[in-house]
A protein has these predicted regions:
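Aromatic sugar-binding interfaces of carbohydrate-active proteins
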Residues: 112-115, 130-181, 191
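Extracellular/periplasmic catalytic domains that process cell-envelope and extracellular macromolecules
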Residues: 9, 36-39, 66-69, 113, ...
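Short tryptophan-centered beta-strand motifs in secreted/extracellular beta-sheet-rich domains
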Residues: 43-45, 117-124, 129-131
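Glycine-aromatic-enriched beta-strand/loop faces of beta-sandwich-type recognition domains
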Residues: 68-116, 168
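Extracellular beta-strand elements of beta-rich domains used
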Residues: 184-188
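Single conserved hydrophobic/aromatic residue that forms the stacking wall/gate
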Residues: 1-12
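Beta-strand-rich interaction surfaces with strong enrichment in secreted/lumenal proteins
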Residues: 30-35, 105-111, 146
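Secretory/extracellular carbohydrate-interaction modules
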Residues: 13-86
């Protein structure tokens, strides 16, 4: 369920309501592409997420413009293959070497009950990505000499709740419906130059 006083959100909610009649469920997301981009700073999201087999909530970021090297920053990603008391942080790097496309992933599991409110934080520096949960360090991804570093350009933020796909790889159960992600706030603090 979406609720907002903005006209754009109201239109989107009507579109979701219309689709409900034609499908068992609808995945949903909001993003900042073309509206707000982020580069170096502190991004905080206070939220609680739905859990259940096949439910796949995530807070993640992609480059505002395409091109190699390409990155993806997963601030929080949950699937029911792990306990409901764990979520994943991941940093993806895709590049070309000798004409071949290579992709590296760097997953890290974090113990936390995502169905409760938490503050998920990304601190983004020129040479590292630092991930925190409720102010506590969870993971740090450092720039390495000689390796691709696609985290030197603006990215946009995506918040979504999907059903199925990779998130359903350990099974699906629609008894978790209806479900919703509750976002209390999102804050961004830009680093001083």
């Amino acid at each position: 369920t979406l609720s907002s006083s903005s006209a754009a959100s109201d239109v989107y909610k009507r579109q979701l309501d219309e689709k409900k009649d034609k499908a068992l469920c609808t995945s949903g997301r909001i993003h900042t592409l073309g509206k707000v981009s982020f580069l170096y700073g502190r991004l905080e999201i206070k939220a609680k997420c739905p859990t259940g087999k096949g439910i796949w909530p995530a807070f993640w970021m992609l480059p505002a413009e395409e091109g190699l090297p390409f990155g993806e920053i997963d601030i929080m990603e949950y699937i029911d293959c792990w306990s409901s008391k764990e979520y994943q942080i991941n940093v993806h790097v895709t590049d070309k070497k000798n004409g071949n496309r290579i992709k590296k992933m760097n997953p890290q599991l974090v113990k936390a009950d995502v169905s409760k409110f938490h503050i998920y934080t990304l601190e983004w520096y020129k040479d590292k990505l630092v991930f925190l949960l409720d102010g506590n360090l969870c993971y740090q991804f450092d720039k390495k000499e000689g390796e691709a570093w696609p985290f030197d350009k603006p990215y946009y933020l995506i918040l979504n709740v999907a059903y199925g796909g990779w998130g359903g790889s350990c099974g699906m159960d629609d008894s978790a419906f209806p479900c919703e992600m509750k976002v209390d706030w999102i804050r961004y603090y830009k680093l001083k130059e």
